[in-house]
């Protein structure tokens, strides 16, 4: 009788404890995270829903010596990730395929650097990247289908030293892209700067965008900006939701190519001086356009280029171009511009914070394959955050003054007229 009673009592004890081998030591995820928070004395903020989620082998995933390893072990099965805010505070977020940690960027740059040691091996890598980026983007299937009609223009509006004219250009499958041309009032050939905009307030209609393009035009450059896919007048055509699709990635690249096709035909454009400049998502587009189009002679991505962030919007990373040639990143894609002039603007408050120590030395190495280290530069603003503020704009002005010979005496943002959004639209 004793032999029967003892196993029965043991079974009751095991069942009461809830964790056992047969159940894979499973616990509710929320309970596990609460215990971890207390154990390591950290605050956890949840950007995910843990309701009903259960974690197998829960307590065995805890590493008493490392909060980082513990959180990674616990969250990975659910495609969640910890994002460190400080030593005592973590945000729990969904897995973000385009965003990694700064340490991951270092590892990726080191791996990429091991693939080429001279110009010849780099050129082979570059050819593979260019071919596979185009394939993954699917751009070559669409370009032959683009309309060849001339754009429709609004009347020219003249201001202090420059003019603005809006346009609407047909692209593919009945779609259009609308934007504005900021041009000097002086006659003759001028450099051209294509200016894809990012996700800053009001897009291309915002004050900062108008200040930059108007100032560059006053100094002697023809500048063009255009709506993001699903923003501005594009939203009237395809809806705002279209911006949050992979299609936006393709169409914004196609729009940039078609606008350049048309702009270099203008009599006032010097085709030997063709630049591209944008910030944030516009900086991501800047790099992509240089990969897709060899006609650019100068590039200036601002607060965008990184080895550990590909761009958080589908318009930047909706198509898997970072999988090209076995894996790449925006820093390597930017390096493909060598040996032509490039200036990268970075700051201490976003994913470009590592640029001086990681991405810029990498760019210098690639430019060194062409003995052109002097053609690549970095303006780093360690105390600034993610924006297109005056110091960043001044860096842009200086780059194009030096590279394209713009007239520095005309550098005065106060002379630019800020127009209302309706004035910048191509459609009535």
Report the location of each language-model feature.
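Glycine-rich nucleophile elbow surrounding the catalytic serine of serine-hydrolase chemistry
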Residues: 278-290
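Alpha/beta-hydrolase fold nucleophile elbow
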Residues: 268-280
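Alpha/beta-hydrolase-fold serine-hydrolase catalytic core, especially in secreted/extracellular enzymes
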Residues: 57, 64-67, 93-176, 345-428
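Proline/glycine-enriched tight loop/beta-turn segments at coil->beta junctions
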Residues: 159, 174-177, 184-193, 199
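N-terminal export/assembly leaders
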Residues: 18-97
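Bacterial Sec-dependent N-terminal signal peptides
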Residues: 1-23
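Mobile cap/lid helix-loop segments that gate and shape the active-site cleft of serine hydrolases
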Residues: 296-335, 340, 347-360, 369-372
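Cap/lid segment of the alpha/beta-hydrolase catalytic domain
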Residues: 188-268, 304-315
